[in-house]
Amino acid sequence: MQQQKGEEVYYVGIDVGTASVRVALVDQFGTVVDQVEQSIKIWEPQPDHYEQSSDDIWAACCQVTKQVVRTKDPRCIRGLGFDATCSLVVLDTQFQPLAVNSQGEHKRNIIMWMDHRAGCQVDRINRTNHKVLRYVGGVMSVEMQPPKLLWLKENLREECWNKSGQLFDLPDFLTWKATGDNTRSFCTLVCKWTYSLDHGWDDSFWKEIGLEDICEGNYVKIGNQVMSPGASIGNCLTATAAKELGLPEGLPVAASLIDAHAGGLGVIGASLKEYGLEGENHPITSRLALICGTSSCHMGISEKPIFVPGVWGPYYSAMIPGLWLNEGGQSATGKLIDHVVHGHIAFMELENQAKARGQHIYTYLNNHLDKIKKSGPVGFLAADLHVWPDFHGNRSPLADLTMKGMVVGLTLSKSLDDLATLYLATIQAIALGTRHILETMQTAGHHISTLYLCGGLSKNPLFVQMHADITGLPVVLSKEVESVLVGAAILGACASGDFPSIKEAMEKMSKVGKIIFPNHEDKRFYDKKYEVFLKLSSHQKEYQAIMGRM
């Protein structure tokens, strides 16, 4: 990268998460200079239906970006990158929002990633055993786009399906709004739509599942022009978008990433040299990036394709060009912790106590656990309390939407101690789920020696330590906590031409903050917890079988 001495260089990263838009100004060293966040609306008209508005999201992107760049010389801003959740955006033939609901509310034109309305449709898709399913862990998830498209065709044919003109993954919608070019990203199409880099779309798949009309016009509705993440799209930032965002016209705009993949990009390239960590020279393929927020995604990369049952992929060049990606995940993690804590009868007491001390509720709970642990490790407080965390189905490695949450060991207690212990057991369950995914990936051929954590839950020291203790692996935290935003900015840096490749940009812009090591003396305890954890799963399947015989 060529740069004049003293010249300021910045990239803008825009991250559209589940509940908010965040924008950061990031320099060429990966330092977040400024960032602003704004919430976005979520509608839940009925259980398992989650909807958003593309107009609302774009307006938030514009408002927040203007705030972030307001004090900077536009000439210093060299590239723009987007990431977003893998939600489905529906537009009509005039590129206007089209309702994805029976109420006809056109503003609500997004089926969110966590929407599970298409359960029947995904079951039928999986029964086809089509060859494309081999690249999604053998079983397609209800959170992917084909079952959602099929649901729209079968439930809103006249109102929505027949009127649709463009069907975007949210990250691609954002780059279209910025550039006027509806080119899609390899990341979105490969990971969520069954696109193959080698063969493109598979006509036989869409025809077999009843979506033969998707093939019309050379797949014009879902994308027939595709680019690698970080490549500069079209004619760059349009005059209209530049005015709305407060950025210079003609600014390079990168092909996008899904938010979890941006997190992986922002954290997994950080060098471990000089940290005294065993295996510091191990390749990037020995690292598992864990992006943990509302849900969690587990990103493992390899030089050759590895097929892992129940784990999405292998996807070629979906995150890092030239490397294969496997993506495990848990559909509810941060959302699960909130659900458990907010639903406890002692929650009001917790809120009052935390407020009186000027603390966040989770900071207070962590401190409270330290107070009640007595002489043993904190984790041992949950020796008799066990949680199976699939309150929103199992994404990996069971790939089973029918799985439900379980709690074993409840008492009549209404105390704050009881709430704190349940909170601890829930975090342990999430970490045990990570171990389950990790061991499945290892068995299939991955060799993981280090976890790299980012996302909102990585700010919680208890969550981080439990992942280290339960997996037995060191956990690397990024110097920049907001690694997803850094990942989006890395895309912009690549689009600008300042870096010749994503790999080089990752190495320069990703930095280690600290490393958390496991308490190996607690291994026997967590091995026993893991044994119970696996029994909870097998027992639940037994219960389903018993009740299914009625």
UniProtKB/Swiss-Prot annotation:
Gene Ontology cellular component terms for the protein in this record: cytoplasm
SUPFAM superfamilies, per the entry: Actin-like ATPase domain (SSF53067)
Cited Gene3D superfamilies: 1.20.58.2240, 3.30.420.40
Entry keyword set: Kinase, Transferase
One Pfam family of this chain: FGGY_C
Superkingdom of this protein's organism: Eukaryota
GO biological process, one term: pentose metabolic process
Name of the protein in its database record: FGGY carbohydrate kinase domain-containing protein
Species lineage: Eukaryota, Metazoa, Chordata, Craniata, Vertebrata
